[in-house]
């Protein structure tokens, strides 16, 4: 049996110019954020690209040439900070600095957001990396950890206990230690009954093999961990033999389920999904309201309007507003030739036009 970790490289390696197949999400990997207009300022200055933030790694690729890309696993990151950098596309600006170490080689990456004033580049990468760092219990073998509280296993998010077996001997010493054995969907945990701090947590991610072997204590459950976790060989004595066999079957079954869909424990949700640029664009609305008509303006009436004296205009305004609520007003308004602009000057001229259209020009001297 191979551990999931033997095939897992995404969070434990730094790679350049990876294939499209390697850029795809592996089982258990989730895309958390996607940022366009990101520049790899140190390696590809002046080249606009896209940054993918997953629960295991950060991927950058050029938009013009997708084969120009890089992948940075969170386990390789030593430090993340923000500094000022010189970008060909934005000039001097704040950038995200990521210092990594992989196979005794250090790499430094500088990413610049080409969208002015957007903090998503910093918040997404830094927050997801922090979530990765605080969820190592899902992925790392842990000895003498704070696992037990009031004789109960402290469950991780999304973790479920499938079996709890009392009276299990840990065979790490000559005389053995009596304790309690937990089988969950994420890991195997054992702790001593006399001392809760004497314990071990073995994630399925780190398990290389699960077998029943003979020992000086009789048949025992033997778990071999991956080389990355130290290559431990841990033995547990479970009685009776039938219970031992059932436990091995259950662990192997849960290990297969986990291998098909691993739970890496990196949980992070964007508080607000980024909006498209089109959604952020607000259409300008004019203050004036126009009602356009299909018919042409009556040239005769317009010529008569130009001959009305100031005194006559005032009389017409009074007549119009005293009859505003009569039936002809609404009817005339809807038959208006031309346009209405709701301001103090043009509305008076339009009302005058309505009145003359309905009553002729007999008041004009």
From Swiss-Prot:
The record's section on Pfam families has:
BBL5
Q: What is this protein called?
A: BBSome complex member BBS5
**Sorted UniProt keywords:** Cell membrane, Cell projection, Cilium, Cytoplasm, Cytoskeleton, Membrane
Q: Which InterPro entries match?
A: BBL5, BBS5/fem-3, BBS5_PH, PH-like_dom_sf
Explain the purpose of this protein. Answer: Required for ciliogenesis.
Gene Ontology cellular-component terms for this entry are: BBSome; centriolar satellite; ciliary basal body; ciliary membrane; cytoplasm
- A GO molecular-function descriptor: phosphatidylinositol-3-phosphate binding
Q: Which GO terms describe its biological process?
A: cilium assembly; intracellular transport
| Protein family per UniProt | Belongs to the BBS5 family.
- Keyword Lipid metabolism in annotation: no
Q: Which SMART domains would you find in this protein's record?
A: DM16
Which residue ranges run through the membrane?
none
Range of residues in the leader sequence? none
- Subunit organization: Part of BBSome complex.
**Compartments reported by the entry:** Cell projection, Cilium membrane; Cytoplasm, Cytoskeleton, Microtubule organizing center, Centrosome, Centriolar satellite
């Amino acid at each position: 049996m191979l551990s999931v970790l033997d095939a897992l490289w995404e969070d434990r390696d730094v790679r350049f110019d990876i294939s499209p197949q390697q850029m795809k999400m592996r089982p258990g990997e989730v895309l958390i954020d996607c940022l366009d207009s990101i520049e790899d300022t140190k390696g590809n200055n002046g080249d606009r690209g896209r940054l993918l933030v997953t629960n295991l790694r950060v991927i950058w690729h050029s938009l013009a040439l997708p084969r120009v890309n890089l992948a940075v696993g969170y386990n390789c990151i030593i430090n993340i900070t923000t500094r000022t950098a010189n970008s060909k596309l934005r000039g001097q600006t704040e950038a995200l600095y990521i210092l990594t170490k992989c196979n005794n080689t250090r790499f430094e990456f500088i990413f610049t957001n080409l969208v002015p004033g957007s903090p998503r580049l910093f918040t997404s990468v830094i927050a997801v990396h922090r979530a990765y760092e605080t969820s190592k219990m899902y992925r790392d073998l842990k000895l003498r950890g704070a696992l037990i509280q009031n004789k109960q296993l402290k469950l991780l998010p999304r973790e479920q206990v499938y079996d709890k077996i009392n009276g299990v001997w840990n065979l790490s010493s000559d005389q053995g230690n009596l304790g309690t054995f937990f089988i969950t969907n994420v890991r195997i945990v054992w702790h001593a009954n006399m001392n809760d701090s004497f314990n071990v947590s073995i994630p399925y991610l780190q398990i290389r093999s699960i077998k029943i072997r003979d020992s000086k204590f009789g048949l025992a459950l033997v778990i071999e961990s991956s080389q990355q976790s130290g290559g431990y060989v841990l033995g547990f004595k479970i009685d009776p033999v039938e219970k031992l066999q059932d436990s091995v079957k259950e662990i192997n079954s849960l290990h297969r389920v986990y291998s098909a869909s691993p739970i890496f424990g990196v949980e992070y949700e964007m508080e607000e999904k980024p909006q498209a640029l089109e959604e952020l664009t607000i259409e300008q609305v004019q203050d004036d309201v126009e009602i356009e008509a299909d018919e042409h303006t009556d040239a005769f009436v317009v010529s008569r309007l130009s001959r009305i004296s100031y005194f006559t205009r005032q009389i017409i305004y009074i007549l119009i507003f005293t009859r505003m609520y009569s039936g002809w007003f609404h009817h005339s308004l809807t038959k208006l030739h031309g346009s209405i602009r709701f301001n103090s000057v043009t509305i008076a001229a339009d009302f005058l036009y309505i009145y003359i259209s309905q009553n002729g020009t007999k008041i004009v001297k």
